């Protein structure tokens, strides 16, 4: 998956790691890593969960990290997961973040790993789908974690993995997402020198898009109320036309 390589490429650029040694190790273990990433992506795509309800997703991520010899922390953001990869050489602390929630969208593709999950959302029976690529984000970060956890001797500094829930927005009346994780003190003990995330895109294989500052802003919904003032047609100046 090209996003796995994009995130690893970013690491080679931003962290003073022994990139040559890591690249050589990746070449030697490429097929095994890619098989894992593909399997994870299919699994999480088949079993998506909505914001603040990512219970099975959280459990599966934590179990995968344990198998890598890491110690997952599930105390932040209700259904979030964090874990450290400690390099054997001094260097910065870099955080890598992936979002994990799905959307109330019914999948229409008939694939072996298509989502068949359903729920009641705002009074309607709807499907649940990873329609925004978060399944690929989870799989990519797990792939990077799997690779780096086996190469800590070549890693200068530490990596903080952040699997963030509720990126699409917490349910009405609930807290969630990155804001809640920060409120709960995710960086109180150790503050990263930098944080990097990524999103699936239409970039060609081998390309990495980035820019300083905000990137890929989301579209938000809002509701407004316009109040008019009734008047007679012969005296429009006494009224307020809400349409105009």
Where are these regions (language model features)?
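Acidic/His- and Gly-rich active-site-bordering loop/insert found
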Residues: 22-130, 139-143, 147-160
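General alpha-helical segment detector with a strong preference for membrane-spanning helices
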Residues: 6, 103-105, 137-139, 203, ...
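Bacterial N-terminal signal peptides
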Residues: 6-16
């Amino acid at each position: 998956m090209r996003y796995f390589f994009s995130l690893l490429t970013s690491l080679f650029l931003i962290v003073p790691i022994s990139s040559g040694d890591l690249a050589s190790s990746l070449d030697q273990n490429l097929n095994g890593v890619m098989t894992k990433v593909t399997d994870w992506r299919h699994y999480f795509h088949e079993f998506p969960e909505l914001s603040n309800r990512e219970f099975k997703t959280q459990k599966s991520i934590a179990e995968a990290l344990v198998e890598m010899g890491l110690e997952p922390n599930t105390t932040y953001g209700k259904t979030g997961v964090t874990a450290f990869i400690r390099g054997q050489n001094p260097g910065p602390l870099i955080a890598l973040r992936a979002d994990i929630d799905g959307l109330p969208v019914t999948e229409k593709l008939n694939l072996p790993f298509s989502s068949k999950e359903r729920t009641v959302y705002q009074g309607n029976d709807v499907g649940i789908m990873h329609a925004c690529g978060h399944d690929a984000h989870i799989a990519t970060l797990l792939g990077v974690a799997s690779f780096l956890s086996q190469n800590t001797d070549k890693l200068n500094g530490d990596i903080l993995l952040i699997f963030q829930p509720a990126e699409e927005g917490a349910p009405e009346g609930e807290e969630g997402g990155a804001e809640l994780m920060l409120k709960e003190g995710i960086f109180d003990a150790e503050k990263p020198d930098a944080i990097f995330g990524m999103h699936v895109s239409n970039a060609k294989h081998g390309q990495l898009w980035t820019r300083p500052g905000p990137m890929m802003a989301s579209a938000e919904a809002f509701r407004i109320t316009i109040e008019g003032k009734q008047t007679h047609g012969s005296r429009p100046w006494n009224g307020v036309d809400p349409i105009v």
